[in-house]
Design a protein with these regions (language model features):
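N-terminal ligand-binding/catalytic initiation module
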Residues: 1-79, 85-87, 91-94
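Glycine-rich phosphate/ribose-binding loops and adjacent secondary-structure elements
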Residues: 75-117
Length: 117
């Protein structure tokens, strides 16, 4: 399914339906979904709204990526990339400090059995 091909109404129904099906696995102390490819603040708003309806009270901490107007965090839209940059910078500093060469192969996944995003 390509969310870019859905109408706004269909996208909202899909988002709310996803929460309804996974409700019992989500929550502030369990799993807090975050935006990913092809999601945005509107989608996350629908999701937190649906979760809150099911929970019977407002639960802004159950989803990240919400707009600031409903409890989102300033800078969230770039936080993942910024965190990745910090990790890369720390890694490069450690390599330079050890005076090691960085080996890059044409296929860095060759021979690997698992990939973690």
């Amino acid at each position: 399914m390509n969310p870019k091909e859905l109408s706004e109404r269909e996208l909202e129904q899909l988002s709310r339906g996803w929460v309804q099906k996974l409700y019992k696995y989500l929550g502030q102390l369990d799993d807090v979904p975050a935006p990913d490819v092809n999601t945005n603040g509107q989608i996350m708003s629908w999701m937190v709204d649906e979760y809150s309806k099911l929970a019977g009270h407002w639960t802004p901490g159950t989803f990240t990526g919400k707009p600031l107007s409903i409890g989102g965090s300033l800078g969230r839209d770039t936080a993942t990339a910024q965190g990745g940059l910090y990790v890369l910078e720390a890694y490069l500093r450690s390599v330079i400090a050890k005076n090691e060469a960085i080996q890059v192969s044409e296929n860095p996944l060759q021979g690997k059995k698992i990939v973690i995003q």
